[in-house]
């Protein structure tokens, strides 16, 4: 099966193929993924990079502007680049690889993140037989954020064998825009920082502007960040996981959805749940209309999960979402 489920990830942990600086990481296991957490080591760096054949420790010496100790809370300023070492280490077997993506909250806060590995030639992919540390590049784009050691911004999924590209179904995803209704939120230009450990704490109207269009469309402004929702209701069975793959630029002049993974059980509490879409325009304003295609949801089969699927039982934050901002807002 392409995705390893919770029980199969637990086996990797018991076999010391996933291990951590922390005493236990069992609580970090999701239905078909593992939360990755920040260590205390973090650096503000001059530029993004891909290691290729250069040791990351050498790159840090070349690019580091300052070292930040995350054993206590620290500011990560918007539009600056940071590299944080993660707590987790891997000793993957030769038939298992990993792929990382931002968690839902990370995407909704417009925090651009990418996992980097030693000798890595692309972001977010962990090769078969990889043995070593993991690092996370962090670029807050709309808000300055406050973070601390053990915070999770990303998650990793694991694939077995060569089945990672086997899709069992795919569905086009479009955007929902309704006139005279709150149809989107736009991030405000604000200097106040957001402490990511504070849940249901911040007033949304201080950080977000409600978009209420007069027609079933509106213009997204260049270099602005928006939260919208899909027209389609998504329902992921207990023996499935899904990933939202953004369409190519030929479908629109924007980037959509930073956090594109859906766990088994998502939307199973009712007839389905809309996907929340994170959208940022490129270099020009762009009109977006109700029903406009933005991506494709690819379904993959996994071994069925009998319990601890996505939802209220495992304290999932967005199990009953509609057009929902990050969990830090009330």
Task: Give the ranges of each region predicted by the language model.
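DUTPase catalytic domain/fold
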Residues: 1-330
């Amino acid at each position: 099966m392409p995705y390893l489920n919770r029980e199969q990830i637990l086996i990797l942990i018991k076999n010391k193929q996933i291990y951590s600086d922390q005493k236990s990481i069992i609580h970090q296991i999701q239905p078909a993924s593992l939360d990755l957490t920040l260590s205390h080591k973090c650096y503000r760096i001059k530029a993004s990079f891909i290691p290729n054949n250069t040791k990351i420790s050498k790159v840090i010496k070349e690019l580091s502007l300052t070292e930040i100790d995350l054993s206590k809370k620290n500011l990560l300023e918007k539009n600056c680049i940071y590299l944080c070492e993660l707590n987790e280490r891997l000793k993957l077997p030769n038939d298992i690889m990993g792929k990382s993506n931002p968690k839902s909250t990370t995407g909704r806060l417009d925090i651009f993140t990418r996992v980097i590995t030693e000798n890595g030639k692309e972001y977010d992919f962990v090769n078969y037989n990889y043995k070593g540390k993991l690092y996370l590049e962090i670029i807050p784009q709309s808000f300055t954020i406050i973070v601390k050691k053990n915070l999770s911004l990303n998650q990793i999924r694991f694939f077995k064998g060569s089945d990672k590209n086997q899709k069992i179904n795919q569905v086009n995803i479009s955007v929902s825009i309704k006139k005279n209704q709150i149809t989107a939120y736009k991030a405000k230009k604000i200097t106040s920082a957001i402490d990511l450990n504070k849940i249901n704490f911040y007033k949304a109207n201080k950080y977000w502007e409600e978009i209420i269009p007069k027609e079933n469309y509106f213009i997204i402004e260049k270099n602005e960040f928006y939260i919208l929702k899909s027209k389609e209701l998504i329902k992921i069975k207990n023996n499935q996981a899904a990933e939202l793959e953004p369409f190519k630029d030929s479908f629109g002049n924007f980037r959509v959805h930073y956090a594109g993974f859906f766990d088994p059980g998502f939307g199973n509490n009712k007839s389905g749940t809309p996907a929340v879409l994170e959208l940022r325009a490129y270099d020009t304003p762009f009109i977006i209309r109700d029903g406009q295609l933005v991506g494709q949801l690819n379904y993959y089969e996994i071994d069925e999960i009998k319990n601890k699927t996505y939802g209220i039982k495992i304290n999932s934050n967005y199990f009953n979402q509609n057009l929902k901002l990050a969990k830090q807002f009330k």
